[in-house]
Amino acid sequence: MATPKIVLTADRTLMSPYRGISLATFFGCAPAIDPNRDKNSFWYKILKNQVTPKVLFDFICNWSPDINGVAKYAPYGLRKVEAGLLRDGYARKDVVIAHPNHIEKFIGPETEVVGTYEMDPLGMGPVTMTFTFGRKQTSYDEFYNAELHHRINAAKKKNGSHAKVIAGASGTWQYNYAPEKIEEYGLYAILEGELGGIAPEIDGHAGRFFDYLIDGQFENMDPFRKRKDFKVDIKEYKRGDNTYHGRFVNFWDRP
């Protein structure tokens, strides 16, 4: 069976109803792993590197339902993009919001783009930074975002897909401060902007944005040219002896 051209998804922390407990949505900010825990300590003997027990987190952050792998519920931003693509001429069979637990089912040779919705992908939000002592520990937000990207890359390799992976939504600014993750996750582009990323900035331009992605028009787009659609910046980061690059896309619809 052919796979869709465009696959949209989000990690577990953004796809959970949290058992209907409103404040539980902050639970993703909780520390998951302490990589520096003393292996001779009492807590290491009980929990290993876990801080907040995973069994507790997974109970509260329960899975949202799916229908044959398609997410029944999804973040509003993803629904906006989905609706925009259908409005702009993409066929229903070519666009899917995949449940993160079934992402492998939808990535294949026909897949052109995988888009992820990210609010706190690297655990740099203010609440998360407080709970993790400034990222000395790994939050569940970061833990499950990393898991999602590793699964996407594994699915691409297994299924022979050359899909471009893009990240969007309000947390994409965090990649500026940990650019090594751009390389680790294999991100082709990062969609950022003042209003929160993947949906508001391309509202009314969803089809054009994905046409550009699929056609390769973001490869060498002139960042200094004022235009009525998108602006691309190729950023370079030095981290010790390593150099990283990131392709950042902004919606460019200003007077």
Positions of PLM-derived features:
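Conserved radical SAM core fold
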Residues: D120-G134, G196-I198, D203-G207, D253-P255
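Intrinsically disordered, low-complexity regions
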Residues: C29, R135, G197-I198, H205, ...
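Radical SAM [4Fe-4S] cluster-binding motif and immediate context
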Residues: E219, P223-P255
